[in-house]
């Protein structure tokens, strides 16, 4: 339900949508950072609005309340959108049970104010964007007035931030220092944890500060911070404990650390975006899962020389060695490519460590994202954290449950055939399970749930009883039985923002949980199932707009019963590799392929039909109404979310590395991309050249075209020119995901040459074109 701020009685000014003030703060270049509480926020005291002064453009007789409302809702770059003013009125229900539109604010003062403010901001922007603001963000009311109720001259950002006190979710009340939206703040962002074999040291992999912090396991004092490569993701110890391995995803390297000297002794090249890393028990081989190249690199553990690559599933990321060391299990964050509009399917790739060959592929039907895997000490139970989307039906009626089922798949001698069980409860979801740990005595399974910001605790004997006491479904899954978890989930322990990796101490009495977006480690007493202490990692205490936006992106607290958040569909801020039918476009209409979020800035409008002009429109009331079905963002939370998304960087392009020349195939592909005549000498119209629609640094001219790919269930034929940023990674393709490969865009879905002139190209020439596209 849209939030609206009512104007003073009798004024006829607009009821405003929740996105309005947020947009003003986004485009102002600085934002104050309130933190969303995990509990229901109490109704604030009514605000008072001082009489405005220095009204040079607005009507002179406006009250403070009226000026405040106008400033909130006006943003020139949005243009004149009907629903900015004419919102649904919940107090005025029509004959079919739907709220009528509110036309009470269609008044002369409002129109006069809008015209004046549009003219003013348009004049300012002509010079401001060209000479002052390199970010390309337009000026709005909030640029100068920065949240003040009185009209006054612009104040520099350093002096304009207002002191605020907010309550951090699950934490204490404290003042939050302000940071400008674009400030780079060096947070730690702990991602994975690991104890040394003797239990005396705790290794903390910090993704944002790009280091391993070595803590004394008794006092938690820092022994040393060890710098590693860019955006580290995986960490593991050699069997002897004398070497620590860290994967660096943006460098495609592996850092080797001597645990005696705590120094990096070697850096070895591996595959594209290395994630998990494990050394086998013999010390002969290192295995590295590469998320982008979808394979596992096998290295000589002594020299780092690569011996072979083993084909894995899509998005190979996390590794777990069986307790006997004979098998290595690989999980994948993206589903394998499948026929259009079929249920997703991932896999667990099983590798024989002695021979370094793929032994088996365990299918995970209906599963999209798969994360950590763990074994009991005796090897008789294997557990993997995953989630199971229901994407073949319209994403509607979230209150009925089951659109993202958070599950575990169990296998092993104690389980029998693999079986999927849900973690969700009837009124509380265990959103996005990530880390898994099993107690040494096999009595408990612990799962970190990123979106729910909690650790779920499972009683293993009760779980096994549940599995064996019931007839097994033919599908091998109890995923949609929301009553099932009551049989084995015994605790849900609140922790910090975005809990990820965790580890038990040697006795199993303490569970350490890395809270990535809070720079803390929660220490859970496993006997009482409560947080006994919290380690606060050294680093900045400022909560920047980007940091708060990232917290908002990864939490599921806004979704009905905590079911979903942004990161459900955009895994690690990217995409999920599946297609959806979203309710706003109509049931069964406009099937859409999920887009990559990185590098979005400068590619607006959004949606495949170009229906949303900017990120606040994309992520504001529309998202709250159709996806969350519950709590709304406050104005500044929406602002910070948009700031975070707009500032997501693009990862290194493996097909066009800095300092490298194009390959001959890429050069030939570029010539095809920019050509203006076909192979028969016929001119290609400007509108049918690749380089016209896909121009500019992001590979889009941001316009709508009919490229002949629409389907009977689409609401229109015009589609926005898709950006080419990271196109090599984002299969499937086209607006509805019907093309599984780049080649299919032209070989299957371009019979009339409406999507570029390509039917004169040979197979080899299409390959050249694709090689060039991958460089974008």
Where do the model's predicted regions map?
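Periplasmic c-type cytochrome electron-transfer domains
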Residues: 72-84, 90-92, 176, 192, ...
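Predominantly soluble domains enriched in secretory-pathway, periplasmic, or organellar proteins
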Residues: 31-36, 97, 119, 155-553, ...
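Long, charge-rich boundary regions
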Residues: 123-146, 152, 181, 605-620, ...
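Bacterial N-terminal signal peptides
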Residues: 12-28
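N-terminal secretory signal peptides that target proteins for export/translocation
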Residues: 1-10
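Extracytoplasmic c-type cytochrome modules immediately beyond a signal peptide or single-pass transmembrane anchor
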Residues: 26-170, 516-532
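Short microdomains enriched in Cys/His and/or Lys/Arg
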Residues: 103-124, 162-181, 270, 586-602, ...
């Amino acid at each position: 339900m849209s939030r609206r701020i009512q104007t003073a009685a009798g004024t006829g000014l607009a009821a405003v949508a929740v996105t309005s003030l947020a947009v003003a703060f986004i485009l102002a270049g600085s934002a104050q950072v309130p933190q969303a509480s995990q509990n229901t926020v109490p109704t604030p005291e009514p605000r008072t609005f001082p009489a405005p002064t220095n009204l040079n453009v607005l009507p002179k007789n406006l009250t403070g309340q009226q000026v405040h409302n106008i400033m909130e809702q006006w943003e020139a770059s949005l243009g004149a959108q009907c629903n900015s003013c004419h919102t649904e009125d919940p107090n005025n229900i029509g004959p079919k049970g739907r709220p009528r539109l509110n036309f009470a604010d269609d008044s002369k003062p409002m129109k006069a104010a809008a015209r004046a403010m549009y003219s003013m901001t348009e004049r300012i922007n002509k010079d401001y964007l060209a000479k002052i603001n390199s970010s390309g963000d337009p000026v709005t009311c909030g640029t100068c007035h920065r949240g003040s109720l009185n009209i006054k001259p612009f104040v520099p950002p350093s002096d304009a931030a207002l002191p605020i006190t907010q309550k951090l979710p699950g934490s204490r009340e404290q003042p939050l220092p302000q940071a400008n939206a674009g400030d780079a703040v060096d947070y730690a962002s702990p991602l994975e944890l690991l104890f040394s074999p003797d239990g005396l040291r705790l290794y903390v992999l910090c993704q944002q500060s790009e280091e391993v912090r070595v803590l004394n396991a008794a006092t938690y004092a820092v022994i040393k911070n060890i710098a590693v490569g860019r955006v580290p993701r995986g960490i593991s110890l050699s069997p002897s404990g004398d070497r620590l391995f860290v994967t660096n995803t943006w460098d495609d390297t592996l850092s080797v650390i001597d645990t005696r000297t705590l120094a990096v002794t070697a850096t070895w090249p591996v595959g594209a975006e290395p994630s998990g890393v494990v050394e086998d028990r013999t010390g002969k081989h290192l295995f590295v899962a590469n998320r982008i190249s979808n394979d596992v690199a096998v290295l000589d553990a002594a020299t780092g020389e690569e011996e072979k690559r083993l084909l894995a599933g899509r998005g190979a990321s996390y590794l777990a060695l069986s307790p006997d060391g004979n098998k290595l299990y690989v999980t994948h964050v993206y589903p394998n490519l499948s026929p259009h509009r079929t249920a997703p399917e991932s896999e667990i790739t099983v590798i024989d460590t002695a021979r370094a060959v793929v032994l088996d592929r365990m299918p995970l039907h209906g599963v999209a994202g798969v994360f950590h895997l763990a074994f009991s000490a005796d090897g008789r139970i294997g557990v993997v954290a995953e989630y199971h989307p229901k994407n073949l039906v319209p994403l509607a009626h979230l209150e009925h449950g089951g659109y993202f089922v958070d599950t575990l798949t169990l296998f092993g001698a104690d389980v029998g055939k693999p079986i999927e069980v849900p973690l969700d409860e009837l009124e509380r979801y265990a959103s996005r399970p990530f880390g898994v740990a099993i107690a040494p005595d096999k009595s408990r399974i612990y799962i970190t749930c990123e979106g729910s910001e909690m650790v779920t605790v499972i009683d293993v004997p009760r779980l096994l009883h549940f599995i064996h006491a019931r007839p097994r479904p033919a599908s091998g899954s109890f995923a949609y039985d929301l009553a099932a978890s009551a049989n084995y989930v015994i605790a849900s322990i609140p922790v910090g923002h975005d809990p990820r990796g965790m580890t038990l101490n040697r006795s199993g009495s303490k569970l350490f949980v890395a809270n990535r977006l809070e720079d803390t480690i929660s220490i859970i007493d496993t006997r009482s199932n409560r947080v006994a202490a919290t380690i606060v990692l050294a680093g900045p205490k400022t909560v920047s707009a980007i940091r708060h936006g990232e917290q908002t992106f990864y939490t599921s607290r806004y979704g009905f019963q905590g079911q979903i958040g942004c990161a459900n569909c955009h895994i690690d801020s990217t995409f999920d590799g599946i297609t959806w039918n979203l309710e706003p476009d109509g049931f069964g209409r406009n099937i859409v392929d999920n887009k990559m979020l990185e590098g979005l800035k400068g590619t607006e409008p959004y949606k495949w039909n170009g229906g949303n002009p900017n990120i606040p429109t994309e992520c504001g009331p529309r998202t709250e109404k159709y996806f969350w079905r519950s709590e709304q963002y406050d104005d500044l939370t929406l602002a910070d979310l948009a700031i975070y998304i707009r500032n997501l960087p693009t990862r290194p392009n493996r097909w066009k590395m800095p300092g490298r020349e194009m390959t001959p195939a890429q050069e030939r592909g570029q010539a095809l991309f920019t050509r203006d005549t076909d192979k028969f000498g016929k001119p290609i119209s400007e509108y049918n050249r690749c380089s016209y629609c896909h121009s500019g640094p992001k590979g889009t001219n941001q316009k709508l075209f009919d490229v002949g790919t629409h389907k009977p269930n689409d609401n229109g034929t015009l589609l926005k020119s898709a950006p080419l940023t990271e196109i090599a990674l984002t299969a499937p393709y086209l607006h509805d995901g019907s093309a599984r490969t780049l080649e299919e865009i032209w070989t299957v879905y371009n019979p009339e040459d409406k999507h570029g002139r390509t039917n004169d190209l040979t197979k080899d020439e299409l390959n050249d074109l694709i090689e060039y596209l991958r460089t974008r």
